[in-house]
């Protein structure tokens, strides 16, 4: 399980961290009631700072997830789901306003990513006084690769098998899978692609992990 620090203030909190997972140099803080933390089998959560502050918060990390240096803040009635075999460099995730961020299976997030479902400060209309920048959920599909220093803002949905180029800021959703998104403003720059993790394969047919994309 490794060395980690865990602190809790509140009641009816459930913390379930698999004994097969490594959580070295990680700080997990839970402040509030009725919160749930699940970290599955064979995960590596290293040098991370995860903070749940509020009530009815859910953190779910599936099996075989690797995370090196996550700074994560979740507020009341929010949830973060990271599905199996996703790997993440150092980065920041912020969830508030009863929102959700979901990251699919077998994703790869390079260092410097920032994902948030909220602006964290209100903006009001001078015409009627109403707030105009409410939080919105963020959904990242399966097998998505975020390059270095990518920013994902509130309300963004990314389909399966997408590459997002380094330093791209995504503020709107895309519907087309199997593509590369890059630039400022972000746009599709390449279509009909699939990406892999290993450099030594000559073609996609040599990589058994990609079978589902062409069969």
Curated annotation (Swiss-Prot):
Annotated signal sequence range: none
Keywords, in A-Z order: Transferase
GO biological process terms held by the UniProt record: protein homotrimerization
Known EC number: 2.3.1.-
CDD domains: LbH_MAT_like (cd04647)
Recorded consequence of changing residue 171 to A: Reduces activity 48-fold
One Pfam match: Hexapep
Keyword presence, Transferase: yes
UniProt: acetyl-CoA binding residues: 119-121, 148, 154, 166, 171-172, 190
UniProt KW Transferase keyword: yes
SUPFAM superfamilies: Trimeric LpxA-like enzymes
Catalysed reactions listed for this entry: [(2->6)-alpha-D-glucosyl-(1->4)-N-acetyl-alpha-D-neuraminosyl](n) + n acetyl-CoA = [(2->6)-alpha-D-glucosyl-(1->4)-N,7-O-diacetyl-alpha-D-neuraminosyl](n) + n CoA; [(2->6)-alpha-D-glucosyl-(1->4)-N-acetyl-alpha-D-neuraminosyl](n) + n acetyl-CoA = [(2->6)-alpha-D-glucosyl-(1->4)-N,O(9)-diacetyl-alpha-D-neuraminosyl](n) + n CoA
Membrane-crossing residue ranges in chain numbering: none
Molecular function (Gene Ontology), one example: polysialic-acid O-acetyltransferase activity
Function description: Catalyzes the O-acetylation of capsular polymeric sialic acid consisting of polymers of (2->6)-alpha-D-glucosyl-(1->4)-N-acetyl-alpha-D-neuraminosyl residues. Shows high substrate specificity toward polymers of sialic acid that contains a large number of residues.
Assembly and binders: Homotrimer.
Family note: Belongs to the transferase hexapeptide repeat family.
Miscellaneous note of the record: Polymeric sialic acid-containing capsule provides a means for the bacteria to evade the immune response during infection by mimicking host sialic acid-containing cell surface structures. O-acetylation of the sialic acid residues of capsular polysaccharides alters their immunogenicity and susceptibility to glycosidases.
The protein's name: Polysialic acid O-acetyltransferase
Organism, scientific name: Neisseria meningitidis
């Amino acid at each position: 399980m490794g060395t980690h620090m865990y602190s809790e203030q509140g009641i009816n909190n459930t913390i379930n961290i698999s004994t097969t997972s490594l959580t070295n140099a990680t700080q997990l803080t839970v402040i509030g009631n009725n919160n749930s933390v699940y970290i599955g089998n064979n995960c590596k959560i290293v040098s991370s700072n995860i903070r749940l502050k509020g009530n009815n918060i859910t953190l779910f990390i599936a099996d075989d997830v690797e995370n090196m240096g996550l700074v994560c803040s979740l507020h009341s009635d929010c949830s973060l789901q990271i599905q199996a075999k996703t790997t993440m460099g150092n980065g920041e995730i912020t969830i508030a306003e009863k929102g959700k961020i979901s990251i699919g299976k077998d994703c790869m997030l390079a260092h410097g990513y920032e994902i948030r479902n909220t602006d964290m400060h209100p903006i009001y209309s001078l015409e009627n006084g109403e707030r105009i920048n409410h939080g919105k959920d963020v959904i990242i599909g399966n097998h998505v690769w975020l390059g270095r220093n990518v920013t994902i803002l509130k309300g963004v949905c990314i389909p399966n098998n997408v590459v997002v180029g380094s330093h791209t800021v995504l503020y709107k959703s895309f519907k087309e899978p199997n593509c590369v998104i890059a630039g400022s403003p972000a746009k599709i720059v390449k279509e009909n692609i699939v990406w892999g993790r290993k450099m030594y394969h000559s073609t996609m047919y040599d990589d058994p992990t990609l079978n589902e994309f062409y069969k």
